Amino acid sequence: KKRESLYIATKTGAQTGEGLREDLKKSLENLRCDYIDIYQFHNPAFCPRPGDESGLYDAALEAKKEGKIRHIGITNHRLYVAKEAIESGLYETLQFPFCYLATEKDLELVEACREKDMGFIAMKALSGGLITNSAAAYAHAAQYENVLPIWGVQRESELDEFLSYIDNPPEMTEEIAEL
């Protein structure tokens, strides 16, 4: 029952189906679990698809059928790959940079994911340290029902700060919006 209460996401930088299978095996061993909840292709230069020559998506589908992964996701920094992944309908999550400094194109990605019932994992929610007000960053992300921010926590105090927002979430006030 403990494992069922925990959601595990990891990624592979593999370039081939065989590489993905090796990475997945290693991840399952290292994490000491039987399955991964979200297994993501990490920042590929293209959008992996069934039947393409990389074999990545086919290997992920096979692992999903075997019960080794539950959801297939993709991480990316390239807008065109992110758009293609959303439009393909093949992915259950997109991990992409997103913070309150987001551009209109970033906001369009969030909306496109929402329309496709696709989760949006916001990486770099503090913009690599450029944003220092975590309450504002949290309040911004909370405005979007399909956005889950991941925080680059480096100290226990930062973890405590973000955990406190679960019980007492900051809201987007005029004061925070002005930051």
Regions found by a protein language model. Name each.
Residues 13, 78, 99, 127, ...:
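Short beta->alpha junction loops/turns
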Residues 88, 105-179:
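Structured C-terminal cap/extension of enzyme domains
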Residues 9-10, 95:
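Short internal beta-strands
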